[in-house]
């Protein structure tokens, strides 16, 4: 992974829970396209029809709180979201996102809908290119970057088995 992500912002507030991300009535849906067509329906009904591949969510505190459902980060990723920046995350959402290869970044960033943001996962620099402001985050280490680059934990594990690379490096 090159470590730099750039995209258009969708702004959300605090306490965006998993039921807002993907309402419970869709949890028995196995189609990723169907999940993506309802993503963020509980928070912003227009999101699913307007999100584009490469978009970034910027939110407040406690993003992904509520019930544990892996479908929440899966739906976001399949809809085209390439990263989520929030002041804090629910732990299970954070792990589920990393496990599927969706970068989740803890930082307080001022950005509005439509702003363009760049995130350097290696250096820890976040820039709001529209507003001209810069922020810091804890950089991802090489091991975490390799999980994200491989598309998530399962793919990383399978690649590790295939190549014989130890997961202890980095």
From Swiss-Prot:
Q: Which pathway is recorded for this entry? A: Organic acid metabolism; 2-oxosuberate biosynthesis
What this protein catalyses is: (2R)-homocitrate = (2R,3S)-homoisocitrate; (2R)-homocitrate = cis-homoaconitate + H2O; (2R,3S)-homoisocitrate = cis-homoaconitate + H2O; cis-(homo)2aconitate + H2O = (2R,3S)-iso(homo)2citrate
- For this chain's UniProt record, which GO biological process terms are given? coenzyme B biosynthetic process
Q: A GO molecular function for this record?
A: homoaconitate hydratase activity
**Pfam families xref list:** Aconitase_C (PF00694)
Assembly with partners or alone: Heterotetramer of 2 HacA and 2 HacB proteins.
Q: Which family does it belong to?
A: Belongs to the LeuD family. LeuD type 2 subfamily.
Recorded protein name is Methanogen homoaconitase small subunit
**Taxonomic source organism:** Methanothermobacter thermautotrophicus (strain ATCC 29096 / DSM 1053 / JCM 10044 / NBRC 100330 / Delta H)
